[in-house]
């Protein structure tokens, strides 16, 4: 009885606190002239924690400069850990903001959404959803707020942070190589630990002129399960768009940019398909990834409110379709495991791909543009005041142009903790060969290895050419075995295949092993493929 009285007293006090005018975000208090810094965010989180029994905080990561990356868990009942959700019918949704700290709408919108959600006595959404929120994924970049950053952006006038983290890394290019504490934190403490069904990452556009303040799209990499891409493209995203427009009165369109601003009829394209982009990465994991891009030239308040109502639209959909989504994801995992357990000759993995338009065109509200000679000698597009609506092809359907066989397993012959640690961070399961064995495999013989001429995120990234050769190879006990009969089998393939544009070879994890000391010829690529189902004696990795 005493505990019940305390609980309801807490609820009553909650609504007194939420009713106070002081429970506003920095953006709201400043009439959308400013955005929150690190202290502002943490003070606001403290208010939320004191005001509601439905929220708690964890630390997802600690940045290179020593700042905590917050993870907020919201639920009714509030789970203490993922173990509480084993027999729970609710769906887990994760929303992340400020991965680029100059793109701050999501940071403000998530704070506002949580306040408004938690002031309800018994939030309807929380009957069906466990919500995870990180309002500040890049705290080091956020602390560099200045009006000199992103000066072309339409507010907030008192400035925003910078794109990169404390290591000068773009966190939205780090999903595969996982070099930053922030990305390692989200992989370990959110994706692996909580396994959200849906993930949305909030950004601001840098591209074409249009009217809609809010844009979004879905994961697109063709090495993810195509049935999930089709579900988002054909059902989930159109329904969210309609809700955002009809229920919340927010103009919106699917994200992209024009091939040619002077001739927008050529098409609207999403040109970021690799899994280094974290929403595409999430699709490779057999889950639903959403990219939110708020229109850079809309005023700051419109961008924040558009993002705020997009969050509403997402959670409306997730709450109303929780069973459907859970079933789709469960079936996709089973399908991936079955493919890896006994792959056929037709099971393939794309190592190169291209984009084509969807069958249906999209309408974008845009402006005529002019190409202007700047005083510095550059030529830039300038928007005119002449608005036009264009119905154009939407290039977002990525498809394979070159495939290799999807294997039963990969065998890794080098014992490098950087590689095994990377597999663990991603949640990819692996074992070790329990005894010496001769195994029929496919090896990759290198003909040419090239590093890029320019640095990319601190790397001279690799491209490789060679040929596949089948035959028996003797492997010693302790050889690492990565079986593809696991939910993350597609991710394992992307990391370990020699030729993808985002694997361990591309990001230089194998450089020291590929070229002999004196630089003559090439060593054997140290990852072998077991193409067909094979009895491999193994022991678990401890």
Please provide the spans of the model-predicted regions.
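Positively charged n-region of N-terminal signal peptides that target proteins for export
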Residues: 1-4
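Cleavable N-terminal signal peptides
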Residues: 6-7, 17, 173
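Boundary at the C-terminal end of the N-terminal hydrophobic targeting segment
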Residues: 17-24
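Soluble metallo-hydrolase cores and metallopeptidase-like ectodomains found primarily
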Residues: 39-93
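Active-site/substrate-binding loop(s) of hydrolase catalytic cores
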Residues: 86-96, 104-237, 241-265, 270-273
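Hard-cation-handling environments
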Residues: 258-441
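Catalytic centers of hydrolytic enzymes
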Residues: 409, 421-425, 431-432, 448-542
């Amino acid at each position: 009885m005493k505990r019940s009285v305390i609980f309801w007293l807490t609820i009553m006090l909650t609504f007194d606190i939420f009713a106070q005018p002081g429970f506003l975000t920095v953006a709201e208090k400043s009439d959308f002239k400013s955005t929150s810094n690190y202290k502002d965010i943490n003070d606001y989180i403290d208010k939320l924690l004191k005001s509601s029994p439905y929220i708690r905080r964890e630390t997802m990561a600690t940045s290179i400069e020593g700042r905590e990356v917050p993870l907020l868990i919201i639920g009714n009942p509030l789970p203490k850990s993922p173990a509480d959700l084993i027999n729970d019918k609710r769906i887990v949704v994760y929303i992340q903001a400020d991965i680029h700290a100059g793109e701050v709408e999501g940071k403000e919108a998530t704070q506002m959404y949580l306040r408004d959600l938690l002031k309800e006595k018994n939030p309807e959404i929380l009957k069906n959803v466990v919500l995870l929120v990180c309002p500040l994924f890049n705290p080091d970049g956020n602390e560099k707020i200045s009006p000199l950053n992103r000066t072309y952006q339409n507010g907030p006038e008192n400035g925003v942070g910078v794109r990169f983290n404390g290591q000068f890394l773009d966190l939205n290019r780090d999903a595969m190589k996982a070099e930053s504490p922030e990305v390692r934190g989200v992989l370990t403490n959110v994706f692996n630990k909580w396994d959200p069904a849906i993930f949305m990452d909030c950004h601001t556009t840098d591209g074409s002129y249009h009217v809609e303040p809010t844009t979004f799209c879905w994961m697109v990499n063709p090495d993810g399960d195509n049935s999930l891409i089709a579900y988002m493209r054909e059902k989930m995203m159109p329904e969210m768009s309609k809700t955002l427009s009809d229920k919340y009165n927010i103009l919106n369109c699917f994200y992209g940019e024009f091939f040619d601003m002077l001739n927008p009829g050529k098409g609207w394209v999403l040109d970021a398909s690799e899994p280094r982009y974290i929403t595409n990465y999430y699709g490779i994991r057999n889950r639903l990834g959403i990219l939110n891009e708020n229109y850079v030239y809309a005023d700051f308040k419109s961008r924040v409110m558009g993002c705020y109502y997009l969050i509403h639209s997402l959670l409306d959909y997730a709450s109303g379709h929780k069973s459907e989504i859970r079933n789709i994801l469960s079936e996709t995992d089973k399908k991936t495991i079955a493919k890896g357990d006994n792959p056929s000759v037709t099971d393939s993995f794309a190592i190169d791909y291209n984009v084509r338009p969807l069958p249906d065109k999209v309408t974008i509200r845009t402006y005529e543009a002019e190409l202007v000679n700047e005083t510095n000698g550059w030529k830039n597009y300038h928007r005119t005041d002449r608005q036009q609506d264009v119905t154009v092809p939407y290039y977002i359907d990525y498809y394979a142009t070159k495939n290799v066989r999807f294997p039963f397993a990969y065998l890794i012959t080098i014992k490098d903790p950087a590689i095994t640690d990377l597999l663990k961070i991603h949640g990819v399961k692996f074992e070790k060969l329990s005894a010496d064995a001769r195994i029929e495999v496919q090896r990759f013989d290198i003909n040419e290895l090239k590093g890029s001429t320019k640095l990319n995120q601190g790397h001279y990234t690799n491209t490789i050419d060679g040929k596949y050769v089948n035959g028996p190879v003797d492997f010693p006990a302790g050889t690492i075995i990565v079986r593809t009969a696991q939910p993350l089998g597609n991710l394992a393939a992307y990391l370990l295949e020699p030729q993808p544009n985002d694997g361990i070879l591309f990001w230089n994890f194998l450089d020291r092993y590929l070229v002999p000391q004196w630089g003559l010829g090439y060593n054997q690529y140290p990852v072998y493929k077991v193409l067909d189902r094979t009895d491999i004696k193994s022991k678990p990795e401890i």
